[in-house]
Amino acid sequence: MSEDSNPKNDLKLKMYETFRSHIERAENSFWTYMLFYLQFLVGINGAVGILCRYLSNNLQNFPTEIIIAFLALVNILLSLIGIIVIIERGKWFFRNMILTVNLERYILKEEHIKIIPKRYSKFDNFNKVIDTTGRIFISIFIGIYMISVIALGYLANSCKTIILFGTGFFIIVVIIYFLDLLDWIYRRIDSNEYRKVIGVVLFISFIPPLMNYFIYDIINLICSYIPESFIVAMIVILIFVIIDVYYNAKKHIENTIIMLSLERTVNDIDDIIKILKNIRLDDTKKEELKKKLRKIKKLIENVIKLLGGTSENGTQNNNLEEAKSKITEACRKISGNNIFEAINELNEAKYIINNKINELTQSDSS
C-alpha cells in the first residue's frame, strides 16, 4: 500500500481540513458578531440621545442628566465586555494556531502552502495574541469607554451624580466578580456554553429595570444620610478593587502565554526525538537540530522571565533551569554523536516541562 493511500495519513488529512474550515468559519462568524455588537451599541446611544432631546423639549423636569449618566454606565459595561470577549477570542485562536502548526508539521511538506506562515509572519512572537482587527475593535471600545467616563465626570457636579458615578462602577465590579464566579462554578459541573450565556444574560437583564425604577430614590436616600467623606472613601475602595481585577486579568493572560509557550516547547522536543530515532545524522542535520534546541532554550528563558524571581515561583524557576540545562547537555551529546544519551536528556527535560504545565493547569483551575 502506498503512502498516499495510507488510512492513517488519510485520517490526518481529513482532520486537518475539518480543523482548518472550523477555524475560518469561527473567525468570520466572530467578527460579524462583533460588528453587529458595535452597531447595536452605537444605535442605542443614537436612539436614546434623540429621544432625550425630544422629551426634554416637550416635558418639564425631565431627568436628562440621570438618563445620560445611566447610558454612560451601560456604555462602560458593554465596552468592557467587548474588550474581554476579543481578548478571549485572541487566546482561543492563538491556541488553534499552535494546533494547526503541529498538524501541518506532520502532514504537509516544506513546499506546500501552509495556513499559519501565510497569515502570520512572526509566529514565534507569543505575545502577539491580538491581531490587527482585534486592535481596531479594542481601540473603538476604549474610545467609547473614555467618552462615557468623560461624560460622567462632566455630570459629577452634585452629590447625586457623584454617588451615581460610584454606584455604577460598583455595579460593574460586582458584575465582573459575578462572571468570574459563574465561570468557576460552570467549570466544575457538566454543562455547556449556552447555559452559561443564558445565566449571564438573565443576570444583566435585571440591572436596567432596577436602575430605571429605584436608582433615583436610592440616590436621594443616600444623600440624606451619608456624608461626602464616606462617599470619597467608597470611591477609593472601588479603585483598589478595580486594580485588583486588572491584576488578576493580567496574571491570567501571562499564565496563558506561559502555557502556550511550554506546550510549544514539548511539541518541538517530541519532533527532535523522532528525528533522532529515525534519521541518520550528518553534520548539517546536527547543526539544524542544535539550532532548534537553542530556540527552545530561548523560549524557556522567556518563560522564566514571565514567572519572575519571587519566592512563590522560585522552585518552579529552578525546575525550568534544570530543563534548560538538560537541553544544553543534549546539544553536547548530539555533537559527540551520543544519540541515545541525547534522547534521554530530552525526555527528562520534557518530563520536567510537562510537570510544570500540570502545575499551571491546577493553579489556574483553582
Swiss-Prot record:
Keywords: Cell membrane, Membrane, Transmembrane, Transmembrane helix
Membrane topology: Multi-pass membrane protein
Keyword Transmembrane listed: yes
Transmembrane segments annotated in the record for this chain: 30-50, 66-86, 136-156, 162-182, 198-218, 225-245
A GO cellular component annotation in the UniProt record: plasma membrane
Location within or outside the cell: Cell membrane
Main location: membrane
The keyword Heme appears for this protein: no
Protein name: Uncharacterized protein MJ0976
